[in-house]
């Protein structure tokens, strides 16, 4: 068992980039694992029931999936350098930004990636 968090995520995944940036900002030691077919079926799917990115394996052997859930859980475990604003209004705006970025920006990214010939 490793004493570092294992971060399973693709380099091209915006959600994996979100959790990777979060872990770096919080200065939480982790191993960044770009998963392969072996990881999918022998680790990730067995642990969480499906193949999904990003996924974290914690040092205690537990697993977390979904970028927002990962960040919420990690904020509880590592409260220093919090990403949560102090005021209620700022919290609301922060959550709205997260909702927009998680649900709407990937559609724009896919559009620009696949509908512009130069890309």
Language model features by range: what are they?
Residues 1-119:
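GST-like domain detector, emphasizing the conserved glutathione-binding G-site
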